[in-house]
Amino acid sequence: MEVNNLGFIAVLMFLAIPTAFLLIPYVKTASASSGSN
C-alpha cells in the first residue's frame, strides 16, 4: 500500500495531537502524585 507524504503527515498529526493533549495532563498528575508519595 503506497501512502503519499502528505497523507502520512496528516495521519501522524491526527494521532499525535490528541495523544499529546491526553498525555501532558497525565504526566503532570503522575509526576505530582509520585512526588508527594
Curated annotation (Swiss-Prot):
InterPro entries linked to this entry: PSII_PsbM, PSII_PsbM_sf
Record-annotated membrane-spanning stretches: 7-27
Pfam families in alphabetical order: PsbM
Localization (cell): Plastid, Chloroplast thylakoid membrane
Top-level taxon of origin: Eukaryota
Topology of the protein relative to the lipid bilayer: Single-pass membrane protein
One GO cellular component, as annotated: photosystem II
Keyword set includes Chloroplast: yes
UniProt KW Transcription keyword: no
NCBIfam families: PS_II_psbM
Family indicated by similarity: Belongs to the PsbM family.
HAMAP family: PSII_PsbM (MF_00438)
Complex and partners: PSII is composed of 1 copy each of membrane proteins PsbA, PsbB, PsbC, PsbD, PsbE, PsbF, PsbH, PsbI, PsbJ, PsbK, PsbL, PsbM, PsbT, PsbX, PsbY, PsbZ, Psb30/Ycf12, at least 3 peripheral proteins of the oxygen-evolving complex and a large number of cofactors. It forms dimeric complexes.
Entry function: One of the components of the core complex of photosystem II (PSII). PSII is a light-driven water:plastoquinone oxidoreductase that uses light energy to abstract electrons from H(2)O, generating O(2) and a proton gradient subsequently used for ATP formation. It consists of a core antenna complex that captures photons, and an electron transfer chain that converts photonic excitation into a charge separation. This subunit is found at the monomer-monomer interface.
Protein name per its UniProtKB record: Photosystem II reaction center protein M
Natural source organism: Pinus koraiensis
